[in-house]
């Protein structure tokens, strides 16, 4: 049993190149197709099979020195009214937008940072 645990640890810690080499060996010497090896690798090491994040949340961490500029930027970017935008900025850290694409999230972050805000993408 200890040998299996040691083998599993070695398998999980393989680099991408080593996994490719292993897939080639399994295919050439044992007739196991790479798709089957990938299924085995996913079962053994879940971290390696993690999906890329597709939806992001834009989080306003703090307004910074130019709070008025940040309120204006939040108002323009979200379509909120002036009071709602001010309340969102005052409540920092707060979510400006949730479930947006990477491109949209990066655009929002850039605009808010240009206004002086500290922004994080989650």
Curated annotation (Swiss-Prot):
TM region(s), chain numbering: none
One of the GO BP terms on file: translation
Name the record gives this protein: Large ribosomal subunit protein bL12
Annotated function: Forms part of the ribosomal stalk which helps the ribosome interact with GTP-bound translation factors. Is thus essential for accurate translation.
Gene3D superfamilies tied to this protein: 3.30.1390.10, Single helix bin
Keywords annotated in UniProt: Ribonucleoprotein, Ribosomal protein
A Pfam family matched in the record: Ribosomal_L12
Example GO molecular function: structural constituent of ribosome
InterPro entries noted in UniProt: Ribosomal_bL12 (IPR000206), Ribosomal_bL12_C (IPR013823), Ribosomal_bL12_C/ClpS-like (IPR014719), Ribosomal_bL12_oligo (IPR008932), Ribosomal_bL12_oligo_N_sf (IPR036235)
Species per Swiss-Prot/TrEMBL record: Flavobacterium psychrophilum (strain ATCC 49511 / DSM 21280 / CIP 103535 / JIP02/86)
Signal peptide as annotated in the record: none
Quaternary structure note: Homodimer. Part of the ribosomal stalk of the 50S ribosomal subunit. Forms a multimeric L10(L12)X complex, where L10 forms an elongated spine to which 2 to 4 L12 dimers bind in a sequential fashion. Binds GTP-bound translation factors.
Family the entry assigns: Belongs to the bacterial ribosomal protein bL12 family.
């Amino acid at each position: 049993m200890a040998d299996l645990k040691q083998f599993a640890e070695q398998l999980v810690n393989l680099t991408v190149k080593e996994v490719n080499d292993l897939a080639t060996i399994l295919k050439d010497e044992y007739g196991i197709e790479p798709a089957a090896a990938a299924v085995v690798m996913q079962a053994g090491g879940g971290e390696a099979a993690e999906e890329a994040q597709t939806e992001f949340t834009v989080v306003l961490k703090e307004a910074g020195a130019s709070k008025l500029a940040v309120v204006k930027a939040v108002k323009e970017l979200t379509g909120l009214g002036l009071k709602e935008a001010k309340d969102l900025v005052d409540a920092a850290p707060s979510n400006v937008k949730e479930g947006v694409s990477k491109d949209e999230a990066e655009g929002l972050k850039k605009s808010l940072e240009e206004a002086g805000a500290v922004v994080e993408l989650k």
